[in-house]
């Protein structure tokens, strides 16, 4: 017995010594001490576990939300996989079934559970700092549709580069020798284990395992290496190479279903190692930079995480092993210089192995999904291989070819040793199972290598062919026209039109936005060069610009339909021609370049008087193709170099972040003949690829044979017509059938549309309807729904198709910017993927967008190409947390574009109006260009809808989805319009409209001969008979109303026909249709129409949704319905603008509307009843009060004289009865008596007397100079009182001046210069004078009114009172005044003025100009009297101060004097018909309109200075006899062509100040009334309750010495009185 015991002890000692040598660990420990320590540790762990398992309600709720079906927008669980479901902790349960001892099981399980609990307690999502209670592990769910989804957290991009050092040392572990070495080592380990089994009894088995598994602090395998060189942690050894990276992302193994994880359950030894490996790096944990990540080549040592602090305490005799989280500093020298072909070869090898394994797994996969969850024994070796490879996918391809390097070999050997260390700790059963797996791997590795390993030369050749093929699909063609001379005009050059045709002789659309010019400061209207006949027959004038040879015109013809054979075949140039123009302006010698190739160098014909000269230029295809090939080769060379540098230096930072395949970067590498899926095996960087099970599910759904690479590579030629038949381009449903393999609708031999080639690196748009979420559509494979013709090269399999979709088309219409320069396309394709191609929320891209109530979900601009069951790629995750500036700007511009309601339906010509704040070829351009020529599934709608956008409102009929070729026609022609109403906005019983407006291509309202409806109106119901809401109300012109007398209402029955038929008087081209929806009230607005179809002479011209009215009278026009445009011709739109009554309506014009009907809340209890509720038309009293007219005053009996207004006499007496306000003094500056011929009669001092005579009659005055003789001294325009007459004034008494002529004279009137000493003293001037001649009163009973002096000498302020003028005023009838009980003041009026001000002097104070600090001017002005008639003005009526530029020193003879303001030549840019004056320091420029009689003005028209618009008036005020009646801003003259919306105002020739309430005048001047609402808004900025005051920059004082000289002196100025 003792001998046997001794032999066992010796054998145990020998085994212990061998293991101590193999693993460099000291295993000699006393059993009793070890057992006691284990019990203590077990108690401590149990306490910790109990504490950790107790969760508060917040943690429970977080766990429920974060581990369930919730997919958060922050990226925590956004990636989906379809791997078979496994239990997350199935390794624990499997550990319990092992035959090891109870102590070993309990210890192992507790350690693992405690470790998991500690890990969970230190997590936070989704950033680097983990949230408590959030353990970011893989989650497996099963949807209602059946497929399983594997959701796992994303890999963080920013930390990938830090692992490059590790990966360089560990990349060789993937070689074919590794399974062999590992198997040999494992056989040795198994034999050793068997010896150990033989040496010890069953009782001591678990004890010895415990002894062997307890490490010592001096473990050389751990202490001697940094973090990345440590032995593997718990979990499968195959994860060792990437475990640090996975922990960086807060995630465990790649998938809980991995066989190695389930089988290689660690012993207790792995606890500390697991702690070391799971101590998450915290470098930059608090910093999150939402921009494009840059590789950190020298990462700092990470900080210690709380996991390290929470380690359970050990007995005092034990020493804690230090945690080392320090990472090896990376050095650029570690990266070998590799060729891009080597990278591609490595990708081919991986892809081939992956495809082979996947197909084998698919063939042997168990039928029952539950069988997969039972465990590894049920899986074939191919499944094990797949799962094994899945754990190695994060190794970068850039280091896959470094097996020759000694460092790589050493790293591989070290990895094998470390794996054996881990395997040695396993039980014998586990080691035996692993050995079987490795034998199976080794036996088939050679076969896989023979099948899938191409040579470098083959890969390189394939790469060149692929690049050439991909580049055959062009983004755009660039045409340059160089004009060297014209036919003789020395100043101008012009062209009528330039047209481009493709190989099918189809005219190619060119946006005006894509036309540019160089070498001229004034480009002219470049949009006139292209698409002149697009919108209508009426063409604008030809394009002209100043000629400074050589002049270069640039055209960009975009491949909007992504045709594979997109080439330019012919260019037609139409030279300058007008019927009466100078044909010498036409271009003569020109050069034409197509993509930098000269195709034409010659003369263009000169047009004759009958027709323009057309010149067709054929494009040589050889030049174009050779240049294209050259570009492709250059791009290939540069790309290879760039790939070589990026792979070696920056950890393939620019290779699409692993989510965009190298196939994309290297011109879309296609599948080999064996069908390897290079697109799926796309991970050439340090980030994770999608799971194999997802690809398997993807291939299963698509049902496409793997030999797709053998398909013919010729691209399908798209037909030239705009709307090809359905059979030529399959719809989305047909594409889906192709992918499913159920039905093939395409002709035999035709390449499927989803495999048609398209340009590299360019976003694709989708026109399909968005699919429902996966859980709502169990029968449809949503991974393929909604895709357009793919951008894949012919021959790609579905896996590569998916990969390219993810790399290129994550959010088409919002992300990637297109490279305009073809030469830069390959390089830009690599950088745009991770910076721009991102979904802002990283949700499943096919998510449903919420309906807005007005518009349905947009299924184009916001949709993506991969389905809900496809996991989002890594760039999605990163970009979702780093929104890029470019995508944000494109979103902003997209929102701006949507706000262009009415014009956006036809964006082809209006796209250039949007501010070009993005780089050329930005995403907005691409969005618009794509949709201008593409087939859209649903008809492009009216305003607010982009062409090609389809709307997915719930109630919308999807009948047009199958057709997919409807587009709103341009200017449809016909005579009968039928509006078919499909649905309402919610009312189940009634449907109604407020009005319908139709405009023709002439800009005029269409004359309607008949209108009828079916059903006609609600009078067909039994309870009605005389309801006023009939169909004829739709065309009565009253649309913005809530009055029942002007609306139409009819019964509505779901499923039946409801239509309105309108017959035009004459057939015409329809340019605009406006639908005013039912607007009775907010509640009743749900009776408005929703989905309609319009037919014009049986041609469908519109199908879509009409916006619901607001139910109020306030708001913008789009709040009342919708406007549908059928043209974008600027001339037609401007003509419509001027005849459109909609823009006349404002709050002031709504006074004729009825009060809103008193709303009775409808009953809600009969929601399911079929009984139609009763509706009653409002019968409120009419608010309009009849306008009364005052009878005109009877004329005063006229005094009979031989000549009216001419009186003869000798003694003239003037009696002054009132002053302008002074109660003590009255005075005058000068007086003249006007003779019959208008001359001043001579008056001498002895002929004139006064009573009182002067101030000297007062006691306090004795020698005052203001005597009577000053009235006739001839000095009248003055402010010196020694030239004025002043007398004491007593109200109510007579103050008489008597003039006795030497003989009888014919007197026509008087001329006064009132008292003008100062502005304050002007109130001493005379106001009322009664005149008599020889005792006969010749003045009106109230006397003559004398104008008050101005108080300055800015103009000759003489007032000429002619007797005849007063006789005419008495004979003319007074205008009728309207008595109205309510105010008619318009809400848009920006001033409160007396109605029709009356006065003598209308003074315009010009406060500022539009920018010129030295000059200010006007072109013209007109004043209208109370009857709306223009007041004739002469030079005596107009004056200015300063007078003109002639007032400047050294300037004389300038013709821009004030009289030009009234020369009737106003709509001009000729400076000879304008007024210009200098701006002098300290002075306000003034323009005076002076009248001798009180004049009532109803309207003033102003023409701003047009010659130099910045010298025009900006801020000004209007004073009438020194009373301010208006101030505002006069718009600067603009030569731009306007539009129809308020956001793009048309060119207004003049601006109007309205004082009248006459509706006719207001209607006539509706477009020119000055409105300053925007400028009058006062905005106050606040920040944290603090008012922010932006200190305005002090305006610098203008130096008069720097004033530029200006003078126009073509004709002599006429003499003026002042």
From Swiss-Prot:
Its main location: cytoplasm. GO terms for biological process: cerebrospinal fluid circulation. Residues 1-21, 84-106, 119-138, 212-260, 616-691, 706-727, 743-899, 932-963, 1154-1176 are annotated as: Disordered. Disulfide bonds: none annotated. InterPro entries: KATNIP (IPR026704), KATNIP_dom (IPR027859). It comes from the Eukaryota. Keywords: Cell projection, Ciliopathy, Coiled coil, Cytoplasm, Cytoskeleton, Joubert syndrome, Phosphoprotein. Residues 238-250, 801-812, 821-837, 858-878, 888-897, 934-945 have a biased composition (Basic and acidic residues). Residues 613-643 form a coiled coil. GO terms for cellular component: centriolar satellite; ciliary basal body; cilium; cytoplasm; extracellular space; nucleoplasm; plasma membrane. It is found in: Cytoplasm, Cytoskeleton, Cilium axoneme; Cytoplasm, Cytoskeleton, Cilium basal body; Cytoplasm, Cytoskeleton. The modification Phosphoserine is found at residues 453, 660, 691. PANTHER family: KATANIN-INTERACTING PROTEIN (PTHR21534:SF0). It is linked to Joubert syndrome 26: A form of Joubert syndrome, a disorder presenting with cerebellar ataxia, oculomotor apraxia, hypotonia, neonatal breathing abnormalities and psychomotor delay. Neuroradiologically, it is characterized by cerebellar vermian hypoplasia/aplasia, thickened and reoriented superior cerebellar peduncles, and an abnormally large interpeduncular fossa, giving the appearance of a molar tooth on transaxial slices (molar tooth sign). Additional variable features include retinal dystrophy, renal disease, liver fibrosis, and polydactyly. JBTS26 inheritance is autosomal recessive. May influence the stability of microtubules (MT), possibly through interaction with the MT-severing katanin complex. Interacts with microtubules. Interacts with 4 subunits of the katanin complex: KATNA1, KATNAL1, KATNB1 and KATNBL1. This is Katanin-interacting protein. It comes from Homo sapiens (Human). The gene is KATNIP.
């Amino acid at each position: 017995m003792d001998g046997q015991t001794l032999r066992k002890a010796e054998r145990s000692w020998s085994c212990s010594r061998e293991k101590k040598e193999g693993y460099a660990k000291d295993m000699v420990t006393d059993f009793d001490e070890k057992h006691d320590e284990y019990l203590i540790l077990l108690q401590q762990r149990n306490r910790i576990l109990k504490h950790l398992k107790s969760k508060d309600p917040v943690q429970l709720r977080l766990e429920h939300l974060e581990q369930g079906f919730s997919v958060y927008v922050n990226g925590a669980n956004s990636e989906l996989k379809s791997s078979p479901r496994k239990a997350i902790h199935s390794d624990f349960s499997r550990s319990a079934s092992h035959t090891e001892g109870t102590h070993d099981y309990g210890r192992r399980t507790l350690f693992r559970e405690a470790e998991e609990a500690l890990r969970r307690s230190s997590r936070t999502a989704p950033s680097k700092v983990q949230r408590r209670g959030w353990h970011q592990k893989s989650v497996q769910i099963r949807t209602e549709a059946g497929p399983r989804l594997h959701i796992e957290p994303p890999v963080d991009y920013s930390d990938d580069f830090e692992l490059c050092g590790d990966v360089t040392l560990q990349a060789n572990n993937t070689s074919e020798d590794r399974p062999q070495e590992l198997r040999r080592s494992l056989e040795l380990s198994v034999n050793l284990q068997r010896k150990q089994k033989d040496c010890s009894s069953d009782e001591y088995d678990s004890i010895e395992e415990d002894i062997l598994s307890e490490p010592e602090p001096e473990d050389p395998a751990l202490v001697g290496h940094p973090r990345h060189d440590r032995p593997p942690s718990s979990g499968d050894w195959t994860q060792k190479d990437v475990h640090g990276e996975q922990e960086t992302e807060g995630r465990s193994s790649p998938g809980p279903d991995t066989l190695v994880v389930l089988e290689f359950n660690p012993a207790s030894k792995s606890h500390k190692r697991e702690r070391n490996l799971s101590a998450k790096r915290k470098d930059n944990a608090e910093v999150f930079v939402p921009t494009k990540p840059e590789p950190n080549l020298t990462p700092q040592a990470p900080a210690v995480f709380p996991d390290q602090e929470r380690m359970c305490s050990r007995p005092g005799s034990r020493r804690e092993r230090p945690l080392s989280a320090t990472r090896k500093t990376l050095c650029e020298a570690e990266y070998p210089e590799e060729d891009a072909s080597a990278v591609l070869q490595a990708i081919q090898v991986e892809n081939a192995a992956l495809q082979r394994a996947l197909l084998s797994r698919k063939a042997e996969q168990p039928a029952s999904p539950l069988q997969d969850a039972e465990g590894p024994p049920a899986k074939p070796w191919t499944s094990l291989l797949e799962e094994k490879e899945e754990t190695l996918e994060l190794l970068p391809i850039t280091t896959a070819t470094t097996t020759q390097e000694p460092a790589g070999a050493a790293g591989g050997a070290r990895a094998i040793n470390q794996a054996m260390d881990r395997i040695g700790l396993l039980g014998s059963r586990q080691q035996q199972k692993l050995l079987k797996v490795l034998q199976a791997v080794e036996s088939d590795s050679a076969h896989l290598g023979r099948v899938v390993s191409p040579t470098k030369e083959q890969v390189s050749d394939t790469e060149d062919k692929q690049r050439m093929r991909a580049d055959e699909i062009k983004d755009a063609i660039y045409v340059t026209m160089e004009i060297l001379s014209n036919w003789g005009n020395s100043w101008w050059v012009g062209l009528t039109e330039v047209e481009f045709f493709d190989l099918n002789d189809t005219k190619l659309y060119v946006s005006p936005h894509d036309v540019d010019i160089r070498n001229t400061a004034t480009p002219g209207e470049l949009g006139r060069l292209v698409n002149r006949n697009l919108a209508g027959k009426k063409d604008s004038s030809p394009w002209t610009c100043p000629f400074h040879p050589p002049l270069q015109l640039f055209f960009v013809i975009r491949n909007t339909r992504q045709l594979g054979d997109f080439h330019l075949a012919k260019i037609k140039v139409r030279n300058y021609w007008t019927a009466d123009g100078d044909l010498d302006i036409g271009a003569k010698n020109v050069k034409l370049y197509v993509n930098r190739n000269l195709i034409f160098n010659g003369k263009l014909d000169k047009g004759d008087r009958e027709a323009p000269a057309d010149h067709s230029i054929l494009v040589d295809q050889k030049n174009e193709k050779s240049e294209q090939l050259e570009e492709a080769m250059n791009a290939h060379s540069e790309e290879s170099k760039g790939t070589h540098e990026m792979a070696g230096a920056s950890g393939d930072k620019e290779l699409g972040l692993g989510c965009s395949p190298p196939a994309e970067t290297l011109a879309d590498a296609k599948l080999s003949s064996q069908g390897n899926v290079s697109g799926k095996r796309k991970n050439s960087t340090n980030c994770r690829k999608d799971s194999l099970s997802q690809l398997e599910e993807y291939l299963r759904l698509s049902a496409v044979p793997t030999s797709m690479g053998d398909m013919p590579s010729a691209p399908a030629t798209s037909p030239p017509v705009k709307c090809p038949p359905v059979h030529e381009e399959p719809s989305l449903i047909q594409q889906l059938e192709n992918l499913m393999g159920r039905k093939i609708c395409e002709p035999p031999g035709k390449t499927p549309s989803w495999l048609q080639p398209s340009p590299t690196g360019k976003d694709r748009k989708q026109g399909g309807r968005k699919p429902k979420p996966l859980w709502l559509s169990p029968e449809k494979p949503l991974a393929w729904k909604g895709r357009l013709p793919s951008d894949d090269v012919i021959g790609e399999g579905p896996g590569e198709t998916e990969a390219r979709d993810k790399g290129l088309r994550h959010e088409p219409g919002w992300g990637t910017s297109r490279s305009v320069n073809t030469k830069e396309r390959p390089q830009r394709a690599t950088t745009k993927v991770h910076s721009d191609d991102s979904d802002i929320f990283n949700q499943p891209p096919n998510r449903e967008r919420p309906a807005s109530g007005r518009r349905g979900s947009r299924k184009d601009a916001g949709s993506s190409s991969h389905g809900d069951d496809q996991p989002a790629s890594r760039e999605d995750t990163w970009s979702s947390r780093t929104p890029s500036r470019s995508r944000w700007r494109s979103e902003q511009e997209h929102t701006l574009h949507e706000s262009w309601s009415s014009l956006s339906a036809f964006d082809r010509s209006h796209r250039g109006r949007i501010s070009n704040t993005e780089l050329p070829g930005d995403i907005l351009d691409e969005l618009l260009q794509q949709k201008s020529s593409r087939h859209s599934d649903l008809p492009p709608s009216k305003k607010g809808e982009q062409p090609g956008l389809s709307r997915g409102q719930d109630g919308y009929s999807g009948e047009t989805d199958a057709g997919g070729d409807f587009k709103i026609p341009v200017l449809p022609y016909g005579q009968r319009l039928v509006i078919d109403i499909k649905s309402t906005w919610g009312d189940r019983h009634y449907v109604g409209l407020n009005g319908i407006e139709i405009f023709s291509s002439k800009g005029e309202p269409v004359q309607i001969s008949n209108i009828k409806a079916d059903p006609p109106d609600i009078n067909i119901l039994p309870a009605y008979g005389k309801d006023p809401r009939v169909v004829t109300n739709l065309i009565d012109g009253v649309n913005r109303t809530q009055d029942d007398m002007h609306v139409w209402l009819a019964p509505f029955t779901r499923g039946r026909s409801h239509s309105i038929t309108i017959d035009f008087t004459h057939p015409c081209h329809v340019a605009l249709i406006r639908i005013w929806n039912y607007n009775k009230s907010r509640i009743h607005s749900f009776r408005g129409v929703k989905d309609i179809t319009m037919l014009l002479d049986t041609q469908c011209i519109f199908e879509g949704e009409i916006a619901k009215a607001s139910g109020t009278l306030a708001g913008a026009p789009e709040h009342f319905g919708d406007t549908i445009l059928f043209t974008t011709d600027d001339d037609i739109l401007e003509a419509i603008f001027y005849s459109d009554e909609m823009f006349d309506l404002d709050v002031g014009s709504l006074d004729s509307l009825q009060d809103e009907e008193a709303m009775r809340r409808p009953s809600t209890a009969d929601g399911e009843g079929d009984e139609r509720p009763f509706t009653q038309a409002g019968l409120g009293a009419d608010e309009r009060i009849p306008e009364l007219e005052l009878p005109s005053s009877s004329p005063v009996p006229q005094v009979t004289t031989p000549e009216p207004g001419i009186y003869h006499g000798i003694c003239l007496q003037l009696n002054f009865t009132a002053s302008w306000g002074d109660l003590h003094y009255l005075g005058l500056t000068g007086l003249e008596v006007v003779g019959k011929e208008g001359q001043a009669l001579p008056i001498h001092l002895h002929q004139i007397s006064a009573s009182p005579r002067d101030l000297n009659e007062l006691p306090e005055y004795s020698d005052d100079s203001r005597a009577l003789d000053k009235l006739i001294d001839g000095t009248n325009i003055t402010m010196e009182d020694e030239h004025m007459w002043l007398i004491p004034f007593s109200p109510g008494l007579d103050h008489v001046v008597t003039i006795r002529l030497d003989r009888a004279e014919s007197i026509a009137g008087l001329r006064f210069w009132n008292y003008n000493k100062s502005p304050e003293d002007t109130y001493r001037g005379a106001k009322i004078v009664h005149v008599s001649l020889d005792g006969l009163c010749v003045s009106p009973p109230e006397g003559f009114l004398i104008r008050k002096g101005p108080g300055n000498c800015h103009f000759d302020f003489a007032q000429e009172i002619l007797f005849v003028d007063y006789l005419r005023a008495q004979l003319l009838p007074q205008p009728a005044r309207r008595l109205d009980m309510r105010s008619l003041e318009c809400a848009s009026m920006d001033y409160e003025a007396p109605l029709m001000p009356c006065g003598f002097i209308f003074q315009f104070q010009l406060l500022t100009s539009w920018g010129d600090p030295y000059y200010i001017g006007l072109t013209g002005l007109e004043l209208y009297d109370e009857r709306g008639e223009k007041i004739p003005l002469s030079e005596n009526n107009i004056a200015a101060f300063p007078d003109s530029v002639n007032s400047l020193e050294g300037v004389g003879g300038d013709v821009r004097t004030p009289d030009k303001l009234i020369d009737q030549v106003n709509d001009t840019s000729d400076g000879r018909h304008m007024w210009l004056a200098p701006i002098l320091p300290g002075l306000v420029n003034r323009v005076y309109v002076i009248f001798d009689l009180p004049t009532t003005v109803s309207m003033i028209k102003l023409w701003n200075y047009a010659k130099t618009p910045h010298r025009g008036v900006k801020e000004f005020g209007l004073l009438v006899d020194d009373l301010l009646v208006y101030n505002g801003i006069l718009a600067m003259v603009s030569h731009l062509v306007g539009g129809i919306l308020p956001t793009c105002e048309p060119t207004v020739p003049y601006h109007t100040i309205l004082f009248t309430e006459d509706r006719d005048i207001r209607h006539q001047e509706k477009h020119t009334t000055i409105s300053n609402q925007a400028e009058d808004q006062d905005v106050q900025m606040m920040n944290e309750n603090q008012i922010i005051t932006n200190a305005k920059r002090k305006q610098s004082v203008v130096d008069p010495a720097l004033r530029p000289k200006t003078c126009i002196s073509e004709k002599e100025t006429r003499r003026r009185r002042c």
